[in-house]
Regions:
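Conserved catalytic or regulatory cores that recognize and/or transform ribose-phosphate-containing ligands
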Residues: 1, 5-6, 17-21, 25, ...
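Structural recognition of the conserved hydrophobic beta-strand(s) that form the central parallel beta-sheet
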Residues: 9-13
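A mobile, often basic/glycine-rich helix-loop segment
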Residues: 30
Length: 222
């Protein structure tokens, strides 16, 4: 088998897929058990970034709600699979990153297993318009990334969609434009506000997941 002849093996696959509105597993349990992977990682990204890639690279009818559901299904299915096959502590959620590349965290999870895992805690919502504090926060985050595996809540920013939708509503507009993956996209205010509770709920749940998979929380209080 390839796995037996390879020192380091990465398997890139979905845990689930949908076909004709049905949900199906995208893996064979016997094969995954035989493979007995050391680590299971679900890479996640902002809903607007996934939407942009879908319309650019694939012909897949979808809504923002669909993307949020698919993402949650992937996380849950992968975690369940990892626990059944490998046990607790072998599954991680890692963000692709908005302003920074998180590939280093993945590398360290794979090859520097003794390095401590950290959840950086810092103010976000209430300091958006305070540049001096934002600079301090960036220095804090960068310092942690230099020394630890970081599961940074700031590596995803879906609140931006909700803020932009709210601003458009105040202007009396039904659509708004934002830049996503270096491309200007138009979003419907109604479509974004219809998933506001889902976005907030998943942010809340994801933060707990990132904390749970960390060894410690390091807080910055400006």
């Amino acid at each position: 088998r390839t796995a037996e002849q390879t020192e380091n093996l990465l398997v890139n696959t979905h845990a689930t897929f949908r076909w004709k509105h049905g949900l199906f597993p995208a893996f064979d349990h016997d094969q995954m058990t035989a493979l007995d992977a050391d680590l299971y990682i679900t890479l996640v990204d902002n809903v607007d970034a996934i939407h942009e890639r879908l319309i650019r690279e694939h012909d897949v009818p979808h809504t923002l709600k669909d993307i949020l559901v698919w993402r949650e299904e992937e996380i849950l299915a992968t975690e369940v699979m990892s626990r059944i096959i490998r046990g607790h502590g072998c599954f991680f959620v890692v963000s692709r990153g908005v302003e920074r590349d998180t590939a280093l965290s993945v590398y360290r999870l794979l090859f520097e297993r003794n390095r401590r895992k950290v959840y950086p805690s810092f103010p976000m919502t209430h300091v958006i318009n305070v540049p001096q504090i934002l600079t301090q926060i960036d220095l804090f985050r960068n310092a942690l990334t230099e020394h630890f595996i970081t599961f940074d809540p700031g590596d995803m920013d879906e609140k931006r969609l909700l803020y932009e939708a709210g601003a458009a509503t105040q202007r009396g507009e039904r659509q708004f434009n934002i830049e996503v993956n270096n491309r200007r996209l138009t979003f419907s205010v109604d479509q974004v506000t219809s998933v506001a509770d889902d976005i907030d709920g998943q942010i809340y749940a994801r933060d707990f997941k990132l904390i749970d998979q960390s060894d410690m929380i390091v807080s910055f209080i400006p």
